[in-house]
Amino acid sequence: MSGDPTASLKDYQLLELDTAAGNDQAPQLPTKTVLGFTPPLPTLPQPTELVYTKRRRPKRRSRCRCLCFTMGMFAMGVLMTTTLLVSTFVLTVPMVALRTAPCPAQTFGLGDECVRPVSLDAYNSSNSSEIGAVCGAYSEMPAPDNTTVLIMNLLDCLNIGINESAGEKLNLTDTPLANCNFSQNSVCSRKRVGVCYAARPLSPLGELIYKARQALRLDHILPFLQ
């Protein structure tokens, strides 16, 4: 027992030592490499135009929305400014400034009014209402006496140095009436004359504004614009 180094070991330990010694002395067997199938690695797609478009599409959409919003706000601003300017013009322009249409036939313009000389020979009464009846037939008003004298004198001055009478130029039905002033002339002294007047007609723009005010019922609110 003293000469054997393994005498103190147990049986299972001796078995392990024998097995390990046998493995060391056994020849190494050749190993065989088994080839297996490995799938190829996926290749990255090339950056084509389609891929570039997909990447840029969100940015283009955001730019398009921003542009549409800007254009919409600009159009709204232009529309609101135009509406404000037109409304201000319609509400503030005086109607006198829009009476620029030519006077009707057989009348002539004096400022903002159209004047019509008329003959009163067909009326026998001396009542002042007869001139009102004559002017009322034309939807006009009779002028005061002093205005009538001034207008008839003006017509007489227009005939000085002119071969064609003022009555023919003014398309008056009673041509001798235009040549008469209140003088001692025998022809003129037998004539009874009068003058009717009315506001000058509205221009097409004035008629449009007047109708707009009537539609909005602003005539009684803005009487100073008449």
From Swiss-Prot:
Transmembrane region(s): 64-86
Superkingdom to which the source organism belongs: Viruses
Pfam families hit by this protein: UL45
Gene Ontology CC: membrane; viral envelope; virion membrane
Intravirion side: 1-63
Glycosylation sites: N124, N127, N146, N163, N171, N181
Keyword DNA repair: no
Location (main, coarse): virion
Residue ranges that the UniProt entry lists as topological domain Virion surface: 87-219
Location in or out of the cell: Virion membrane
Keyword terms, alphabetized: Glycoprotein, Membrane, Signal-anchor, Transmembrane, Transmembrane helix, Viral envelope protein, Virion
Family per record: Belongs to the herpesviridae HHV-1 UL45 family.
Name of this chain's protein: Envelope protein UL45 homolog
Source organism of the structure: Equine herpesvirus 4 (strain 1942) (EHV-4)
